[in-house]
Amino acid sequence: MIKAQSLDGLFEKLLDGKSIFKNKEVLRPSYTPDLLLHRNDQINSLATILVSALRGETPSNVLIYGKTGTGKTAVTRYVGKELERVSEDKSIFCSVVYINCEVIDTQYRLLANLARHFEEEVPMTGWPTDQVFMKFKEAIDSREQVIIIILDEIDKLIKKGDDVLYNLSRINTDLRKAKVSMIGVSNDLKFTEFLDPRVKSSLGEEELIFPPYDAEQISDILKQRAKMAYNDGVLGEMVIPLCAAFAAQEHGDARRALDLLRVSGEIAERENQPQVLEEHVRRAQEKIEIDRVVEVVRTLPTQSKLVLYSIILLRNRGREGKNVTTGEMYNVYRQLCHHIDVDILTQRRVTDLMSELDMLGIVNAVVVSKGRYGRTKEISLSVPVENTRKVLLEDYRLKPLVDFKASVFNKMFS
Protein backbone atom coordinates (compact mmCIF):
# COMPACT_ATOMS: atom_id res chain seq x y z
CA MET A 1 0.00 0.00 0.00
CA ILE A 2 1.38 3.39 -1.02
CA LYS A 3 1.42 5.89 1.80
CA ALA A 4 0.04 9.31 0.81
CA GLN A 5 2.29 12.27 1.46
CA SER A 6 1.00 14.69 4.09
CA LEU A 7 0.41 18.20 2.79
CA ASP A 8 0.81 19.70 6.26
CA GLY A 9 3.36 22.47 6.16
CA LEU A 10 3.96 22.10 2.41
CA PHE A 11 4.40 25.81 1.73
CA GLU A 12 5.89 26.56 5.14
CA LYS A 13 8.84 24.29 4.31
CA LEU A 14 9.36 26.09 1.02
CA LEU A 15 9.09 29.51 2.64
CA ASP A 16 11.58 28.56 5.36
CA GLY A 17 14.33 28.31 2.76
CA LYS A 18 16.35 31.50 2.22
CA SER A 19 15.50 33.13 -1.11
CA ILE A 20 18.31 34.34 -3.34
CA PHE A 21 15.98 37.08 -4.58
CA LYS A 22 15.51 40.43 -2.91
CA ASN A 23 12.80 41.65 -5.32
CA LYS A 24 12.16 39.50 -8.38
CA GLU A 25 9.53 41.90 -9.78
CA VAL A 26 12.16 44.39 -10.97
CA LEU A 27 13.22 41.83 -13.60
CA ARG A 28 9.76 41.68 -15.18
CA PRO A 29 8.73 43.72 -18.26
CA SER A 30 5.97 45.46 -16.28
CA TYR A 31 8.52 47.20 -14.03
CA THR A 32 9.68 50.71 -14.97
CA PRO A 33 12.78 51.88 -13.04
CA ASP A 34 13.20 55.43 -11.75
CA LEU A 35 16.24 55.79 -13.99
CA LEU A 36 16.19 54.46 -17.57
CA LEU A 37 19.71 53.80 -18.80
CA HIS A 38 20.92 54.57 -22.35
CA ARG A 39 17.64 56.11 -23.50
CA ASN A 40 18.18 59.82 -22.72
CA ASP A 41 17.88 60.87 -26.38
CA GLN A 42 14.57 59.04 -26.80
CA ILE A 43 13.23 60.34 -23.46
CA ASN A 44 14.11 63.93 -24.37
CA SER A 45 12.65 63.61 -27.88
CA LEU A 46 9.32 62.31 -26.56
CA ALA A 47 9.23 64.88 -23.74
CA THR A 48 9.84 67.68 -26.27
CA ILE A 49 6.76 66.54 -28.21
CA LEU A 50 4.52 66.11 -25.15
CA VAL A 51 5.52 69.26 -23.24
CA SER A 52 2.80 71.21 -25.07
CA ALA A 53 0.26 69.29 -22.96
CA LEU A 54 1.54 71.23 -19.93
CA ARG A 55 0.62 74.44 -21.75
CA GLY A 56 -2.91 73.15 -22.34
CA GLU A 57 -2.18 72.51 -26.03
CA THR A 58 -2.67 69.34 -28.09
CA PRO A 59 0.63 67.47 -28.57
CA SER A 60 1.37 65.94 -31.96
CA ASN A 61 0.47 62.29 -32.43
CA VAL A 62 3.57 60.07 -32.30
CA LEU A 63 4.52 56.70 -33.78
CA ILE A 64 7.35 54.88 -31.99
CA TYR A 65 9.16 52.01 -33.73
CA GLY A 66 11.84 49.56 -32.66
CA LYS A 67 12.48 45.87 -32.22
CA THR A 68 11.38 43.96 -29.12
CA GLY A 69 13.29 44.89 -25.97
CA THR A 70 14.60 48.26 -27.16
CA GLY A 71 12.89 50.25 -24.39
CA LYS A 72 9.89 51.63 -26.31
CA THR A 73 7.25 50.75 -23.72
CA ALA A 74 9.49 51.62 -20.76
CA VAL A 75 10.33 55.07 -22.18
CA THR A 76 6.73 55.82 -23.12
CA ARG A 77 5.41 54.88 -19.67
CA TYR A 78 8.30 56.66 -17.96
CA VAL A 79 7.68 59.93 -19.81
CA GLY A 80 3.92 59.57 -19.35
CA LYS A 81 4.31 59.08 -15.60
CA GLU A 82 6.55 62.15 -15.36
CA LEU A 83 4.08 64.19 -17.44
CA GLU A 84 1.26 63.33 -15.02
CA ARG A 85 3.45 64.19 -12.01
CA VAL A 86 4.43 67.61 -13.36
CA SER A 87 0.85 68.37 -14.43
CA GLU A 88 -0.34 67.73 -10.85
CA ASP A 89 2.31 70.10 -9.51
CA LYS A 90 1.13 72.76 -11.96
CA SER A 91 -2.58 72.05 -11.31
CA ILE A 92 -3.13 71.15 -14.95
CA PHE A 93 -5.44 68.27 -15.83
CA CYS A 94 -3.41 65.81 -17.88
CA SER A 95 -4.16 62.06 -18.10
CA VAL A 96 -2.04 59.33 -19.69
CA VAL A 97 -3.94 56.15 -20.57
CA TYR A 98 -1.93 53.02 -21.40
CA ILE A 99 -3.58 50.33 -23.56
CA ASN A 100 -1.92 47.04 -24.56
CA CYS A 101 -3.44 46.26 -27.96
CA GLU A 102 -2.35 42.64 -27.82
CA VAL A 103 -4.97 42.25 -25.07
CA ILE A 104 -7.41 45.03 -26.03
CA ASP A 105 -7.48 44.17 -29.74
CA THR A 106 -10.91 45.27 -31.01
CA GLN A 107 -12.50 48.66 -31.64
CA TYR A 108 -15.25 48.03 -29.10
CA ARG A 109 -12.97 46.84 -26.31
CA LEU A 110 -10.60 49.76 -26.83
CA LEU A 111 -13.36 52.37 -26.66
CA ALA A 112 -15.01 50.61 -23.70
CA ASN A 113 -11.70 50.58 -21.80
CA LEU A 114 -11.13 54.25 -22.53
CA ALA A 115 -14.64 55.16 -21.38
CA ARG A 116 -14.30 53.07 -18.21
CA HIS A 117 -10.96 54.73 -17.45
CA PHE A 118 -12.92 57.98 -17.13
CA GLU A 119 -15.54 56.28 -14.92
CA GLU A 120 -18.24 55.76 -17.53
CA GLU A 121 -20.30 52.61 -16.95
CA VAL A 122 -19.89 50.82 -20.27
CA PRO A 123 -20.37 47.04 -20.66
CA MET A 124 -17.51 45.14 -22.33
CA THR A 125 -19.96 43.87 -24.97
CA GLY A 126 -23.45 44.62 -26.22
CA TRP A 127 -23.64 48.31 -27.08
CA PRO A 128 -23.36 49.83 -30.58
CA THR A 129 -19.79 51.06 -31.05
CA ASP A 130 -21.02 54.59 -31.85
CA GLN A 131 -22.73 54.73 -28.46
CA VAL A 132 -19.53 53.68 -26.65
CA PHE A 133 -17.54 56.31 -28.56
CA MET A 134 -20.12 58.95 -27.62
CA LYS A 135 -19.88 57.98 -23.93
CA PHE A 136 -16.09 58.32 -24.07
CA LYS A 137 -16.33 61.77 -25.65
CA GLU A 138 -18.89 62.91 -23.07
CA ALA A 139 -16.71 61.64 -20.22
CA ILE A 140 -13.56 63.47 -21.28
CA ASP A 141 -15.20 66.68 -22.51
CA SER A 142 -16.65 67.53 -19.11
CA ARG A 143 -13.60 69.70 -18.30
CA GLU A 144 -10.47 71.32 -19.74
CA GLN A 145 -7.86 68.55 -19.93
CA VAL A 146 -5.27 66.93 -22.18
CA ILE A 147 -5.40 63.16 -22.65
CA ILE A 148 -2.52 61.10 -24.02
CA ILE A 149 -3.56 57.63 -25.23
CA ILE A 150 -0.66 55.16 -25.49
CA LEU A 151 -1.51 52.29 -27.85
CA ASP A 152 1.21 49.69 -27.26
CA GLU A 153 1.53 47.04 -30.00
CA ILE A 154 -0.79 49.16 -32.13
CA ASP A 155 -0.19 46.85 -35.12
CA LYS A 156 -2.25 44.15 -33.32
CA LEU A 157 -5.23 46.52 -33.25
CA ILE A 158 -5.24 47.44 -36.94
CA LYS A 159 -5.31 43.80 -38.01
CA LYS A 160 -9.05 44.06 -37.33
CA GLY A 161 -9.46 47.40 -39.11
CA ASP A 162 -8.38 51.00 -38.58
CA ASP A 163 -11.81 52.60 -38.08
CA VAL A 164 -11.14 53.25 -34.41
CA LEU A 165 -7.85 54.99 -35.20
CA TYR A 166 -9.59 57.11 -37.82
CA ASN A 167 -12.25 58.16 -35.29
CA LEU A 168 -9.73 58.85 -32.52
CA SER A 169 -7.47 60.83 -34.88
CA ARG A 170 -10.43 63.14 -35.66
CA ILE A 171 -11.89 63.29 -32.15
CA ASN A 172 -10.57 66.79 -31.38
CA THR A 173 -12.93 68.31 -33.96
CA ASP A 174 -15.86 67.09 -31.81
CA LEU A 175 -14.49 68.26 -28.44
CA ARG A 176 -15.03 71.67 -26.84
CA LYS A 177 -12.88 71.41 -23.71
CA ALA A 178 -10.70 68.30 -23.83
CA LYS A 179 -7.80 67.60 -26.17
CA VAL A 180 -6.60 64.12 -27.20
CA SER A 181 -3.24 62.96 -28.49
CA MET A 182 -2.12 59.42 -29.40
CA ILE A 183 1.16 57.54 -29.15
CA GLY A 184 1.37 54.33 -31.18
CA VAL A 185 4.10 51.84 -30.27
CA SER A 186 5.06 49.01 -32.63
CA ASN A 187 7.78 46.44 -33.35
CA ASP A 188 6.76 46.50 -37.02
CA LEU A 189 8.15 49.34 -39.14
CA LYS A 190 5.84 48.41 -42.01
CA PHE A 191 2.51 48.31 -40.20
CA THR A 192 1.46 51.76 -41.49
CA GLU A 193 1.36 50.32 -45.02
CA PHE A 194 -2.01 48.81 -44.07
CA LEU A 195 -3.47 52.09 -42.78
CA ASP A 196 -5.92 54.37 -44.54
CA PRO A 197 -3.76 57.27 -45.90
CA ARG A 198 -5.78 59.77 -43.81
CA VAL A 199 -5.10 57.80 -40.62
CA LYS A 200 -1.44 57.36 -41.52
CA SER A 201 -1.05 61.09 -42.08
CA SER A 202 -2.63 62.17 -38.79
CA LEU A 203 -1.24 59.35 -36.64
CA GLY A 204 2.36 59.73 -37.81
CA GLU A 205 2.80 63.47 -37.25
CA GLU A 206 6.01 62.61 -35.39
CA GLU A 207 8.06 59.41 -35.55
CA LEU A 208 10.72 58.06 -33.18
CA ILE A 209 12.96 55.08 -33.96
CA PHE A 210 14.51 53.12 -31.08
CA PRO A 211 17.84 51.42 -31.96
CA PRO A 212 18.83 48.09 -30.36
CA TYR A 213 21.03 48.10 -27.26
CA ASP A 214 24.60 46.83 -27.61
CA ALA A 215 26.12 44.24 -25.24
CA GLU A 216 27.73 46.88 -23.01
CA GLN A 217 24.46 48.81 -22.62
CA ILE A 218 22.56 45.61 -21.81
CA SER A 219 25.22 44.76 -19.23
CA ASP A 220 24.67 48.17 -17.56
CA ILE A 221 20.89 47.58 -17.46
CA LEU A 222 21.38 44.12 -15.94
CA LYS A 223 23.76 45.43 -13.27
CA GLN A 224 21.24 48.13 -12.33
CA ARG A 225 18.39 45.62 -11.95
CA ALA A 226 20.54 42.88 -10.37
CA LYS A 227 21.32 45.15 -7.39
CA MET A 228 17.60 45.52 -6.75
CA ALA A 229 16.62 41.94 -7.61
CA TYR A 230 19.22 39.73 -5.91
CA ASN A 231 20.79 39.48 -2.49
CA ASP A 232 24.49 40.38 -2.26
CA GLY A 233 26.99 37.79 -3.43
CA VAL A 234 24.41 35.59 -5.16
CA LEU A 235 25.39 36.17 -8.80
CA GLY A 236 28.42 34.39 -10.22
CA GLU A 237 31.01 36.51 -12.03
CA MET A 238 30.01 35.39 -15.54
CA VAL A 239 26.22 35.56 -15.13
CA ILE A 240 25.64 39.16 -16.26
CA PRO A 241 28.19 39.10 -19.14
CA LEU A 242 26.67 35.86 -20.44
CA CYS A 243 23.08 37.17 -20.21
CA ALA A 244 24.20 40.33 -22.05
CA ALA A 245 26.00 38.33 -24.74
CA PHE A 246 22.99 36.08 -25.39
CA ALA A 247 20.65 39.10 -25.59
CA ALA A 248 23.01 41.04 -27.88
CA GLN A 249 22.78 38.13 -30.33
CA GLU A 250 18.98 38.61 -30.21
CA HIS A 251 19.19 42.12 -31.81
CA GLY A 252 20.01 43.82 -28.48
CA ASP A 253 16.87 42.68 -26.67
CA ALA A 254 17.00 43.99 -23.08
CA ARG A 255 13.73 42.26 -22.22
CA ARG A 256 15.27 38.93 -23.20
CA ALA A 257 18.32 39.72 -21.05
CA LEU A 258 16.15 40.47 -18.01
CA ASP A 259 14.14 37.28 -18.56
CA LEU A 260 17.41 35.33 -18.70
CA LEU A 261 18.62 36.89 -15.46
CA ARG A 262 15.33 36.08 -13.72
CA VAL A 263 14.90 32.51 -15.04
CA SER A 264 18.55 31.71 -14.22
CA GLY A 265 17.83 32.64 -10.61
CA GLU A 266 14.60 30.64 -10.54
CA ILE A 267 16.43 27.53 -11.78
CA ALA A 268 19.15 27.95 -9.14
CA GLU A 269 16.61 28.57 -6.36
CA ARG A 270 14.50 25.51 -7.23
CA GLU A 271 17.63 23.40 -6.92
CA ASN A 272 18.47 25.00 -3.55
CA GLN A 273 21.69 26.46 -4.95
CA PRO A 274 23.14 29.40 -3.00
CA GLN A 275 24.49 31.05 -6.17
CA VAL A 276 23.40 31.68 -9.75
CA LEU A 277 26.11 30.36 -12.07
CA GLU A 278 26.94 30.28 -15.78
CA GLU A 279 25.36 26.83 -16.16
CA HIS A 280 22.03 28.22 -14.89
CA VAL A 281 22.14 30.95 -17.55
CA ARG A 282 22.73 28.39 -20.30
CA ARG A 283 19.81 26.28 -19.09
CA ALA A 284 17.64 29.40 -18.81
CA GLN A 285 18.52 30.31 -22.41
CA GLU A 286 17.42 26.85 -23.56
CA LYS A 287 14.18 27.01 -21.55
CA ILE A 288 13.24 30.49 -22.77
CA GLU A 289 13.92 29.53 -26.38
CA ILE A 290 11.71 26.44 -26.08
CA ASP A 291 8.96 28.52 -24.42
CA ARG A 292 9.21 31.14 -27.19
CA VAL A 293 8.99 28.52 -29.92
CA VAL A 294 6.04 26.85 -28.23
CA GLU A 295 4.15 30.15 -28.06
CA VAL A 296 4.94 31.15 -31.66
CA VAL A 297 4.06 27.71 -33.05
CA ARG A 298 0.85 27.53 -31.02
CA THR A 299 -0.44 30.76 -32.57
CA LEU A 300 0.43 29.93 -36.21
CA PRO A 301 -2.43 29.67 -38.73
CA THR A 302 -3.43 26.12 -39.72
CA GLN A 303 -1.78 26.30 -43.14
CA SER A 304 1.54 27.41 -41.63
CA LYS A 305 1.31 24.57 -39.12
CA LEU A 306 0.85 22.09 -41.96
CA VAL A 307 3.89 23.48 -43.77
CA LEU A 308 5.96 23.16 -40.59
CA TYR A 309 4.66 19.65 -39.87
CA SER A 310 5.62 18.62 -43.42
CA ILE A 311 9.20 19.72 -42.75
CA ILE A 312 9.27 17.86 -39.43
CA LEU A 313 8.01 14.66 -41.04
CA LEU A 314 10.69 14.84 -43.72
CA ARG A 315 13.34 15.63 -41.13
CA ASN A 316 12.32 12.69 -38.91
CA ARG A 317 11.90 10.06 -41.59
CA GLY A 318 14.52 9.47 -44.22
CA ARG A 319 15.97 13.00 -44.31
CA GLU A 320 17.75 13.24 -40.95
CA GLY A 321 21.02 15.09 -41.37
CA LYS A 322 19.91 16.42 -44.77
CA ASN A 323 18.11 19.63 -45.61
CA VAL A 324 14.60 19.47 -47.06
CA THR A 325 13.82 21.02 -50.45
CA THR A 326 10.70 23.08 -51.17
CA GLY A 327 9.52 20.45 -53.68
CA GLU A 328 9.71 17.64 -51.11
CA MET A 329 8.01 19.81 -48.51
CA TYR A 330 5.15 20.73 -50.88
CA ASN A 331 4.65 17.06 -51.82
CA VAL A 332 4.14 16.07 -48.17
CA TYR A 333 2.08 19.21 -47.44
CA ARG A 334 -0.45 18.27 -50.16
CA GLN A 335 -0.89 14.78 -48.73
CA LEU A 336 -1.43 16.18 -45.24
CA CYS A 337 -4.11 18.54 -46.57
CA HIS A 338 -5.86 15.62 -48.31
CA HIS A 339 -5.78 13.60 -45.11
CA ILE A 340 -7.50 16.23 -42.94
CA ASP A 341 -9.63 17.73 -45.73
CA VAL A 342 -8.03 21.18 -45.82
CA ASP A 343 -7.75 23.36 -48.94
CA ILE A 344 -4.44 22.93 -50.75
CA LEU A 345 -2.61 26.19 -51.41
CA THR A 346 -0.45 26.78 -54.48
CA GLN A 347 3.24 25.97 -54.24
CA ARG A 348 4.04 29.68 -54.48
CA ARG A 349 1.80 30.52 -51.52
CA VAL A 350 3.23 27.63 -49.49
CA THR A 351 6.74 28.93 -50.24
CA ASP A 352 5.62 32.34 -48.91
CA LEU A 353 4.39 30.69 -45.69
CA MET A 354 7.70 28.90 -45.37
CA SER A 355 9.50 32.26 -45.77
CA GLU A 356 7.38 33.62 -42.90
CA LEU A 357 8.49 30.67 -40.74
CA ASP A 358 12.06 31.60 -41.68
CA MET A 359 11.48 35.20 -40.53
CA LEU A 360 10.10 33.91 -37.21
CA GLY A 361 13.30 31.91 -36.68
CA ILE A 362 11.50 28.55 -36.78
CA VAL A 363 13.18 27.32 -39.97
CA ASN A 364 16.25 28.36 -41.92
CA ALA A 365 15.77 28.50 -45.71
CA VAL A 366 18.71 28.97 -48.07
CA VAL A 367 18.55 29.29 -51.88
CA VAL A 368 20.87 26.77 -53.56
CA SER A 369 21.71 26.17 -57.21
CA LYS A 370 21.04 22.74 -58.73
CA GLY A 371 22.93 23.52 -61.92
CA ARG A 372 20.85 22.84 -65.02
CA TYR A 373 17.91 21.88 -62.78
CA GLY A 374 17.60 25.49 -61.61
CA ARG A 375 17.46 26.82 -58.06
CA THR A 376 15.56 25.67 -55.01
CA LYS A 377 15.40 26.44 -51.31
CA GLU A 378 16.87 24.01 -48.81
CA ILE A 379 15.12 24.09 -45.46
CA SER A 380 16.45 23.12 -42.05
CA LEU A 381 14.73 23.37 -38.67
CA SER A 382 15.97 25.96 -36.17
CA VAL A 383 13.85 24.65 -33.28
CA PRO A 384 13.71 21.50 -31.10
CA VAL A 385 11.93 18.92 -33.27
CA GLU A 386 10.05 16.94 -30.64
CA ASN A 387 8.81 19.95 -28.67
CA THR A 388 7.58 21.58 -31.88
CA ARG A 389 5.87 18.39 -33.04
CA LYS A 390 4.01 18.05 -29.73
CA VAL A 391 2.77 21.63 -29.89
CA LEU A 392 1.55 21.20 -33.47
CA LEU A 393 -0.38 18.06 -32.56
CA GLU A 394 -2.15 19.91 -29.73
CA ASP A 395 -4.20 21.57 -32.48
CA TYR A 396 -7.39 19.51 -32.86
CA ARG A 397 -7.24 19.94 -36.65
CA LEU A 398 -3.82 18.29 -36.79
CA LYS A 399 -4.53 15.49 -34.30
CA PRO A 400 -5.50 13.02 -37.10
CA LEU A 401 -1.91 13.34 -38.36
CA VAL A 402 -0.35 11.67 -35.29
CA ASP A 403 0.08 8.30 -37.05
CA PHE A 404 0.26 9.64 -40.56
CA LYS A 405 3.98 9.26 -41.24
CA ALA A 406 3.89 5.60 -42.35
CA SER A 407 1.43 6.15 -45.20
CA VAL A 408 3.36 9.16 -46.49
CA PHE A 409 6.83 7.74 -46.24
CA ASN A 410 6.11 4.27 -47.54
CA LYS A 411 5.05 6.05 -50.71
CA MET A 412 7.96 8.47 -50.86
CA PHE A 413 10.94 6.45 -49.67
CA SER A 414 10.14 2.90 -50.74
From Swiss-Prot:
GO terms (BP aspect): DNA replication
Listed CDD domains: AAA, Cdc6_C
Gene3D superfamilies for this protein: 1.10.8.60, P-loop containing nucleotide triphosphate hydrolases, Winged helix-like DNA-binding domain superfamily/Winged helix DNA-binding domain
Residues given in the record as ATP binding sites: 70-74, 213, 225
Domain of life per record: Archaea
Single GO molecular function: ATP hydrolysis activity
Keywords: ATP-binding, DNA replication, Nucleotide-binding
Alphabetical list of InterPro entries matching this protein: AAA+_ATPase, AAA_22, Cdc6_C, Cdc6_lid, ORC1/CDC6, Orc1/Cdc6_arc, P-loop_NTPase, WH-like_DNA-bd_sf
Segments crossing the lipid bilayer: none
This protein's record includes keyword RNA-binding: no
HAMAP family: ORC1_type_DNA_replic_protein (MF_01407)
NCBIfam families: orc1/cdc6 family replication initiation protein (TIGR02928), PRK00411.1-3 (NF001625)
Role according to the record: Involved in regulation of DNA replication.
Family as reported in the entry's similarity comment: Belongs to the CDC6/cdc18 family.
Name listed for the protein in its UniProt record: ORC1-type DNA replication protein 1
Organism whose genome encodes this protein: Methanosarcina mazei (strain ATCC BAA-159 / DSM 3647 / Goe1 / Go1 / JCM 11833 / OCM 88) (Methanosarcina frisia)
Designated gene of the protein: cdc6-1
